[in-house]
Structure formats: structure tokens, C-alpha cells
């Protein structure tokens, strides 16, 4: 279910940014470097508009290890409970989780 929400969100973003109303599934694949760049650029654009502005907001970039971890987490997602922090730690850094 969470993957469906993710794909629908990505489809809406990509549809708006490309100015098209028809997309193939291949146009949404996050394994495509062009799609990765489009997602990252849109995310960084949105982050720049926060008010008040962040004092030390770093530019976000694509990370294949984190992307793969997020994919695994989404596949085993239980929307009623959070994943333990140990399951959301990559390279010693904890990753956030949002369940809605």
C-alpha cells in the first residue's frame, strides 16, 4: 500500500514537472538516473522554500544504499507500527520513518 502511495505521488510530481498527462511505468522507475535527478531536484527546490529558512540545510543527493534500504522497508511495512531504529540505521546514521 505504501508503495502505491509513493508511486502515485511520484506520478503526480513527474506529470506536473514534465507537462504531460500520459506516463509509462518506466517513466516512474527510480532506478533511472534521470528520474533520480528529477526527484532530488524537486525535493531540493521545495526545501529551499521553507520559511523560516534553515541555517545549515545541506543539499540532498541520491544514495543507492539508502534507496535500497527504503525499498526493503516499504516492502515489509506495517502501517500500524514503526520499524525499530536498528532497522533504520545506515552507516551509523538513523533514518526517519513516517507512517500515515
Curated annotation (Swiss-Prot):
Residues 41-81 form the SCP domain. Residues 1-22 form the signal peptide. It is found in: Secreted. InterPro entries: CAP_dom, CAP_sf. The keyword Signal applies. Its main location: secreted. Pfam families: CAP. The keyword Secreted applies. SUPFAM superfamilies: PR-1-like. One of its GO terms (cellular component) is extracellular region. Expressed by the venom gland. Blocks ryanodine receptors, and potassium channels. Belongs to the CRISP family. This is Cysteine-rich venom protein VAR1.
Amino acid at each position: 500500500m505504501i508503495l502505491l502511495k509513493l508511486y502515485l505521488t511520484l506520478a503526480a510530481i513527474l506529470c506536473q514537472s514534465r507537462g504531460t498527462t500520459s506516463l509509462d511505468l518506466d517513466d516512474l522507475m527510480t532506478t533511472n538516473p534521470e528520474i533520480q535527478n528529477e526527484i532530488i531536484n524537486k525535493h531540493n527546490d521545495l526545501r529551499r522554500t521553507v520559511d523560516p529558512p534553515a541555517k545549515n540545510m545541506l543539499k540532498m543527493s541520491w544514495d543507492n544504499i539508502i534507496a535500497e534500504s527504503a525499498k526493503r522497508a516499504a516492502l515489509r511495512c506495517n502501517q500500524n507500527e514503526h520499524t525499530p531504529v536498528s532497522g533504520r540505521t545506515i552507516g551509523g546514521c538513523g533514518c526517519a520513518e513516517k507512517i500515515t
